[in-house]
Amino acid sequence: MAESTTAVGHDELAALKFVALEGAHSEPIKISCSELSDRLDASSQTASRRLQRLEAAGYLDRDVVTDGQWVSLTKAGETALHKEYTQYQEIFGDNSSVVELTGTVTSGMGEGRHYISLSGYMKQFRERLGYEPFPGTLNIDLDDDSTRTRVAVSSLTGIQIDGWEDDERTFGPATCYPAEIILAEQTAEAAHIIVPERTHHDETQLEVIAPERLRDSLELTDGQRITVQLKPKE
């Protein structure tokens, strides 16, 4: 049974940061426990245990070979480092960092219209977002750089939309993140990225909700490039 993330403390995060600085956030790197122990001022056994804990927590992928091991950060590992980064920004009063995602407008499967309009969600949108969203989502296919940057979104403070159930089925929770949608000189400020816990979309796709139909207010068509900006909570 894998260890829970509670097994990951500051020492393990220091090891995670080191392998990320060595390039493990973008591709697998080869490292020995003796090399890691020198950098962390710990014994080889301690360094090995820290990597094992990171792997058990889902922060690292490891492949042990005869002369070392190949390691790479998982999405959860990247998210953990982004959270550390965001906390340091809060400590030092730097809330200027903006997460910027770019992609192209695309047509969805129409599921957003159905789910957004359900009363169990709509009531929470009105209370927690401060508006009643247009029944549908704006779908964006992220470019390669933004797909990698997207992990930073989960380190921001989101607005929780709770799951609920009716007589027939249960509906999953979601998290909303305040965002600005930018197209040339036009901007839609009252918008949110919505990240459902249950979704058919992968990490390359983004869903946005807003009070108005963004395709109309920004005169959007499929294939247009668009930018989404998110800021840390002030």
Curated annotation (Swiss-Prot):
Please give the biological process terms from Gene Ontology that the record holds.
Answer: FMN biosynthetic process; riboflavin biosynthetic process
What are the EC numbers?
2.7.1.161
Q: Name one GO molecular function term.
A: DNA-binding transcription factor activity
Which cofactors must be present for this protein to function? Answer: Mg(2+)
- Give the Gene3D superfamilies listed for this entry: Riboflavin kinase-like, Winged helix-like DNA-binding domain superfamily/Winged helix DNA-binding domain
Which pathway, metabolic or otherwise, does it act in?
Answer: Cofactor biosynthesis; FMN biosynthesis; FMN from riboflavin (CTP route): step 1/1
* Catalytic reaction(s) noted: riboflavin + CTP = CDP + FMN + H(+)
Note the Pfam families from the entry: CTP-dep_RFKase, MarR_2
- Binding locations of FMN: T199, E207
Q: Cofactor note, please?
A: Binds 1 Mg(2+) ion per subunit.
Supply the alphabetized keyword list. Answer: Flavoprotein, FMN, Kinase, Magnesium, Metal-binding, Nucleotide-binding, Transferase
Q: Binding residues for CDP, per the UniProt record?
A: G108, M109, G110, E111, G112, R113, E212, R213, L214, R215
Concerning SUPFAM superfamilies, the annotation shows: Riboflavin kinase-like (SSF82114), Winged helix' DNA-binding domain (SSF46785)
Q: What domain of life does the native source organism fall in?
A: Archaea
The segments labelled H-T-H motif-like in the record are: 1-98
Residues that hold Mg(2+) according to the record: T137, N139
Spell out the residue ranges making up region: Riboflavin kinase: 99-234
InterPro entries recorded:
ArsR-like_HTH (IPR011991), HTH_MarR-typ (IPR000835), RibK_CTP-dep (IPR039063), Riboflavin_kinase_archaeal (IPR023470), Riboflavin_kinase_CTP-dep (IPR023602), Riboflavin_kinase_dom_sf (IPR023465), WH-like_DNA-bd_sf (IPR036388), WH_DNA-bd_sf (IPR036390)
Q: Per its UniProt record, what HAMAP family does this chain match?
A: Riboflavin_kinase (MF_01285)
Q: Which PANTHER family match?
A: RIBOFLAVIN KINASE (PTHR40706:SF1)
Which family would the database say this protein is a member of? Belongs to the archaeal riboflavin kinase family.
Q: What does this protein do?
A: Catalyzes the CTP-dependent phosphorylation of riboflavin (vitamin B2) to form flavin mononucleotide (FMN).
- List the protein's name: Riboflavin kinase
Gene from which this protein is expressed: ribK
